[in-house]
UniProtKB/Swiss-Prot annotation:
General function of this protein: NDH-1 shuttles electrons from an unknown electron donor, via FMN and iron-sulfur (Fe-S) centers, to quinones in the respiratory and/or the photosynthetic chain. The immediate electron acceptor for the enzyme in this species is believed to be plastoquinone. Couples the redox reaction to proton translocation, and thus conserves the redox energy in a proton gradient.
UniProt topology in membrane: Multi-pass membrane protein
PANTHER family referenced in this protein's UniProt entry, alphabetically: NADH DEHYDROGENASE SUBUNIT 1, NADH-UBIQUINONE OXIDOREDUCTASE CHAIN 1
Gene field: ndhA
Gene Ontology CC: one annotated term: plasma membrane-derived thylakoid membrane
Organism expressing this protein natively: Prochlorococcus marinus (strain MIT 9313)
UniProt-recorded name of the protein: NAD(P)H-quinone oxidoreductase subunit 1
Length: 372
């Protein structure tokens, strides 16, 4: 298997070629990954918001954004600028500190979770070795921010929305974690890079979605619930709770919730692509591509092609799932809160636990096929 492109090593060697010491080159590199994450997340949000507006318009037989740039591509930027210039209001009887801290606790863990998303063998910010555990830990912080925002607003609709959001997130966090553990068990690693590498043996046929179809469905349903997408948008049901925990927010604080929701949707889609759809992997083995080019797998030309196409493959798989999530918004009705909790605790949790046990049994019975 090709070792891929090591961005940090290439960047460091380039700076050392200009006469800088390795220590200085490392210091210059340190802020760049976070800037890259923020840039990728913001671009992902802009593209997703534009897609949602255009797809929603197409479903409703409308045109959608048209005048803000070609095909309305600048409309998301106009929305962001509008929120930036709006007045930042804190209700008189609200808890100012918690009211401000809530949106931050919602957004920051989602952005930090992007650190573990690999776009290639070495095209990721941090291969910590326990990336899946880190992501689950960070995602468990978000309900605290949602509940804090609802409580601090001193508004009954906000409080009910915060309680719903916390209950929903906790209910679906457990089956989601169990579904991921089945994949971890097959790959024998908590590293997202190792999980993708484990799926690159036979191209399309080695993707985890074929060995974990139940886990794939559980993960996707739970991811939609975690992102509060229809049919699971109970925390901000307009007909019942005005805007849920966001009711009293305006301006930049509201924009943080807005960003967090869409960044989380793109992140969830990327993780589905990484865990179940082969990540950056080709539908065909890399060895075949190298053979057609008459090069070795480790040749620079093959590394550049696989690195570039790997990024495209990861993004395409993720946005296919984003497209599906947007379509589901307009084709499924909102469930009731009791149905939401019943689905999580009485249906998805037992199935996820059973899927984990069956995966363990298959791993023992068929170690070659299930990563023994």
């Amino acid at each position: 298997m090709s070792s891929g492109l090591d961005l940090e090593l290439s960047f460091s060697q380039s700076l050392q070629g200009l006469g800088l010491s390795p220590q200085v080159a490392h210091l210059i590199w340190l802020p760049l990954p976070m800037l890259l994450v923020l840039t990728a997340a913001m671009v992902g949000v802009l593209v997703t918001v534009w897609l949602e507006r255009k797809i929603s318009a197409a479903v409703q037989q409308r045109i959608g954004p048209e005048y803000a740039g070609a095909l309305g591509v600048l409309q998301p930027m106009a929305d962001g600028l509008k929120l930036l210039v709006k007045e930042d209001v804190i209700p008189v009887r609200a808890d100012g500190l918690l009211f401000t801290l809530g949106p931050v606790l919602v957004l920051v863990p989602v952005i930090l979770s992007w650190l573990i998303v690999p776009f290639g063998q070495n095209l990721l910010i941090s291969n910590v070795g326990i990336g899946i555990f880190l992501w689950i830990s960070l995602s468990s912080i978000q309900p605290i921010g949602l509940l804090m925002s609802g409580y601090a607003s001193n508004n009954k609709y906000s409080l009910l929305g915060g309680l719903r959001a916390a209950a929903q997130s906790i209910s679906y966090e457990i089956p989601l974690a169990l579904a991921v553990l089945a994949v971890v068990m097959m790959s024998n690693s908590l590293s997202t890079v190792d999980i993708v590498a484990q799926q690159n043996g036979a191209g399309l046929l080695s993707w985890n979605v074929w060995r974990q179809p139940v886990g794939f469905l559980i993960f996707w349903i739970c991811a939609l619930a975690e992102c509060e997408r229809l049919p699971f948008d109970l925390p901000e049901a307009e007909e019942e709770l005005v805007a849920g925990y966001q009711t009293e927010y305006a301006g930049m604080k509201f924009a943080l919730f807005y960003l967090g929701s869409y960044i989380n949707l793109v992140l969830s889609s990327l993780l589905v692509a990484v865990l179940y759809l082969g990540g950056w992997g080709f539908p065909i083995p890399v060895e075949w591509l190298a053979g057609w080019l008459g090069q070795s797998v480790d040749a620079p030309l093959v590394q550049v092609i696989t690195g570039s196409v790997g990024i495209v493959m990861t993004v395409l798989k993720a946005y296919l799932l984003v497209f599906l999530a947007i379509l589901l918004r307009w084709t499924t009705p909102r469930v009731r809160i009791d149905q939401l909790l019943d689905l999580g605790w009485k249906f998805l949790l037992p199935i996820a636990l059973g899927n984990l046990l069956i995966t363990a049994a298959l791993k023992l019975a068929f170690p070659v096929a299930f990563g023994g």
